[in-house]
Design a protein with these regions (language model features):
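Conserved redox-cofactor binding core of oxidoreductases
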Residues: 1-104, 108-110, 173-189
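Glycine-rich loop(s) and the adjacent beta-strand/alpha-helix scaffold that form part
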Residues: 97-189
Length: 189
């Protein structure tokens, strides 16, 4: 498991990984009032927005450990930064995945030193997020054949699902001015 979820261990969550996940604390009085209002109105409670269903009201899970934000960098990168076979390049753009016989063998990068190709004898981990990952795959010739042909990008591998199924995570934020209760903003002053 990648996550260390303090609230759930099920088919959607693990609790032995390095990435800390917990329900947001503390529950402010204003939040308690909101949760109670949702319940009284008859809305469905959701104890896990990252599980099977995303509808309803409830508290969010967050990446906070000991009161501090705990990022993917904290979980995965910082513990291995001193490895001799790891070099971290900042302010560097990956322009393309280099392939040979449909196997990723390196990346083409650009930074203030110029453009260069970095080879790999092991795996290449692509983590550019929901926008940049499919973009980089398509720039590398991996994606829907017709779309790549329209863009005049040489086809490496026809993979129709690349760039598809992007979904918004819909949420509704409601702001109210309240009296007699401390808000998070007031507590942070």
């Amino acid at each position: 498991a990648l996550e260390n979820n303090q609230n759930h261990e099920d088919q959607y969550h693990g609790n032995f990984g390095p990435l800390w996940v917990e329900t947001y604390q503390p529950i402010l009085e204003a939040s308690k009032s909101f949760l109670n209002a949702c319940k009284e109105y008859g809305l469905k409670k959701n104890n896990d927005f990252n599980g099977e269903n995303q509808e309803g009201y409830g508290q969010y899970q967050v990446n906070i450990k000991n009161g501090q934000r705990f990022s993917a960098s904290d979980a995965f990168l910082k513990p291995v930064l001193d490895r001799p076979n790891l070099e971290l390049l900042t302010n560097t753009l990956v322009e393309k995945i280099i392939t040979s016989n449909k196997k990723a063998v390196g990346v083409k990068i650009k930074n203030k030193k110029g453009t260069q190709i970095i080879g790999s004898t092991c795996e290449i981990v692509l983590c550019g997020g929901s926008i940049n990952s499919p973009q980089l795959l398509m720039l590398s010739g991996i994606g829907p054949k017709k779309h790549l042909m329209d863009l005049k990008i040489p086809l490496v591998h026809d993979l129709p699902g690349v760039g598809k199924n992007l979904q918004d995570h819909l949420t509704v934020n409601i702001s109210y001015k309240i009296n007699q209760l401390k808000t998070f903003s007031e507590l942070m002053k």
